[in-house]
Each structure stands twice: as C-alpha cells, then as structure tokens.
A protein has these predicted regions:
Chain B
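A short, structured loop/turn motif at beta-sheet edges
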Residues: 37-41, 71-72, 94-96, 115-125
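Beta-strand elements of well-folded, non-transmembrane domains
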Residues: 36-38, 84-86, 117, 132-134
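Short, hydrophobic/aromatic-rich segments at coil-to-beta transitions
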Residues: 71-80, 94-103
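A generic beta-sheet turn/junction motif
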Residues: 84-86, 95, 106, 119
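Short, surface-exposed coil-to-beta transition loops
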Residues: 29-31, 86-90, 107-113
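Beta-strand/loop substructures that line and gate deep hydrophobic ligand-binding cavities in soluble
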Residues: 101-161
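Hydrophobic ligand-binding cavity/cleft-lining segments
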Residues: 1-71
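Hydrophobic pocket/interface hotspot
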Residues: 43-54, 80, 93, 126, ...
C-alpha cells in the first residue's frame, strides 16, 4: 500500500495506540447511512449494500432467475455509482427498487433463452386458484417473460398497487393489469401441470 | 403467493461480486482478480491473519499491527496500523469470511479483499482492490494498478508454494 497523497516518507508518525477507537457513535442506519455513503465513505457504502442485499436479492432472483446473481451485482454497481444523484436519501428504498427491477429485466432479457409468449397464453378469466399455496415458484416464473415477472413480483411480493407498478416500470396502468392477468394465468397453468 | 412456505427464487451477492461493486463505484480504484492454487479453507484463513499475511504479499507494507478486534455480528471489526514507506496509518477493518474492507482514517486509503471457493473448494478466486479515494489522485491510479497486480502475483506464488 503506497502512502496517501501529501504524506512523505519519514513524516510524522503517530504511536500505535493513537488510532480511532472502535467505540463511538451508534451504527449508522437509514438516512445517515445513505448520506455517509454519498460522501464516499466506503465502509458506509458496503454497509448500505449489506442492508439492501436481502431485498435486492428477492427482486433480482424472482425476475432474473438463474441470472439473478449477475443482476444483483449490476444493481449494486448502479446504486453505488449513482448515489450522488439520489436527491432524497429517505427515498433510497424506492430508488433502489427501480434500479433493481431495471437491471434484473435487462440481465434476464440478455440471457433469455426459452420464454413463453404471454400473448399465446390463456386469455380467459383470472384463475380461481389459491396461489398462496405455491411452494416452488421458480419453474412457473421461468415460463414468463422478464417484464411479466417484474409485474408479478412488484405486485405480489412487494405489495405495490397497479398504479405504483405502472409508474415504476414506465408503462400504462392498463398494461400492468393486462400483464398481471396474463402472468397469473400463466403461473396457474404451469403450476397445474 | 406470499404464503410463508412459498419459495421465491432469491439471488445472492457473493463476497467477490460485492467487492467488484465497490471497486466500480470508488473513484480511482485499481483492482486485480485471479485464482489461487490453494484450497479456500487454507487460503482465506491465511489472508485473514492480516498481521502476518499482508506484509508478505504486499511489498509496500513493512508492518501491520492489530490494535484491537471485536466481534460484530457475523464479522469482526479491527483497528489496525499499517506502516508503508515509513508512514504509519490507522485503519478500521471489517473482516468476514471471504471479505475484508480496510479503510484508513479520513478515508485516505482503501483496501478491499474478497475470496470465494472454486472447483469445489480446491482452489480460491481472489479479488484485490486498492484506492486513494480523494479528489486529484487519478494520477496515482497507474501506480495502484501495478501495486495490486504485484500483490496478486505474490499471493499466487505464495499459494502455489503452500504459503
């Protein structure tokens, strides 16, 4: 490790006991953590990643499936690189959600192999099945396009309203309703096989 | 679909992906990545013994002394002093299984190391990053690139000879 700028060899050297004590203010959380990360504090950036990891893992896993880990890395690269553009630190979770969904869809589309055409799926009434009973959803999700998985995840896992999902994805509310209907139908059809 | 038993696929961010994300965001960061010819269960504990490992693979660190260590959840927090080019600099360290972040006081210097088992643990993927994340330090980047590349070469050699 080279010396930091402005420090010359042979300069003043503090004694080994003069470092910063570990005991200090309470751990940073929430807004303060975001502010510290924005200032370039790498420990705070890493703490922010750890705090957001479970949520981002759920979004990226459900949308990007087997490429979920890649999507997660891309999400955190984008989050950390663009923290300075986050105007309101308190809105960090919504901001990260938007990035995670975008990156997960992008990564999934790039890796896409066999995906069913939702338009070809049953356009009938929404299935009257108890989807809460679903245990293993991966195979069902795999039959949907990344965009449909995003709608499903945001609505069913995140609990966002259709209007919120539409705003986040930048599509009309009617498109969300349509995608949701098709996704649920496809989900139920695949599950029933 | 939100039943407690439902298993939605969940993605994971491994130590190396986490370190790569930091490296991509920290200004002026230089990084190197490679595979060590040593089992993870041997390589990481050796690296994590910072007092002994860092001065051996980082030619620019003459000494590293751990002043304090305490558990912090699944990690350890350390307070250390590293001496390089005659300058002794205090660092705060977060040390986990496979991940180590060392940040100098006033963020003058940053070191991140990460490792993961590959080939069923028979070998170890290792990631090393250093940065002087301060304005106006871009000219240092070429030097940092050479330094982290040399560190990785040293570590690779040490791993191949059984440390």
């Amino acid at each position: 490790m080279p010396p930091p700028p402005g420090r010359s060899a042979g300069g003043p050297r503090a004694g080994p006991e003069s470092g910063e004590p570990l005991a200090g203010p309470a751990p940073l959380v929430g807004v303060e953590l975001v502010r510290a990360a924005r200032r370039g504090d790498a420990a705070a950036m890493d703490a922010l990643v750890r705090e957001l990891m479970p949520y981002v893992g759920r979004v990226c896993g459900a949308i990007a499936l087997d490429r979920g880990d890649d999507a997660m890395q891309e999400t955190f690269v984008a989050v950390l690189r663009n923290l300075h553009g986050l105007r309101e630190p308190a809105a960090v979770h919504g901001w990260v959600r938007r990035i995670a969904v975008r990156e997960a869809i992008r990564v999934a589309r790039a890796a896409r192999t066999e995906v069913l055409d939702p338009g070809a799926l049953d356009r009938g009434a929404a299935p009257a099945v108890d989807l809460d009973a679903v245990v293993d959803v991966r195979s069902a999700l795999a039959g949907l396009s990344p965009e449909h998985r995003a709608v499903l995840v945001l609505r069913e896992v995140d609990g966002l309203s259709e209007a919120e999902v539409a705003g986040l994805l930048g599509v009309a509310e009617g498109t969300v309703k349509s995608r949701l209907h098709r996704a649920r139908a496809a989900f139920a059809r695949r599950w029933a096989r | 679909m939100n039943a407690p038993g439902a298993r939605w696929p969940v993605a994971a961010l491994g130590p190396i992906a986490r370190a790569r994300a930091l490296a991509a965001a920290v200004p002026g960061a230089a990084s190197a990545e490679g595979v060590l010819d040593a089992p993870y269960d041997v390589a990481w504990p050796w690296v994590a013994d910072l007092e002994h490992s860092v001065p051996r693979f980082d030619a620019q660190v003459r000494a590293l002394r751990v002043l304090e260590r305490r558990p912090h959840g699944d990690a350890e927090e350390l307070r250390i002093r590293a001496t390089s080019f005659g300058v002794s600099l205090p660092f705060t360290v977060r040390l986990e299984n496979g991940f180590c972040l060392m940040q100098a006081r006033r963020r003058l210097y940053l070191v991140v190391m990460a490792a993961e088992p590959v080939e069923e643990g028979a070998r170890t993927r290792f990631f090393h990053m250093e940065a002087v994340p301060l304005p106006g330090t871009r000219p240092l980047r070429r030097h940092l690139r050479r330094a982290v590349a040399a560190d990785l070469r040293n570590l690779t050699r040490l791993a191949s000879s059984g440390f």
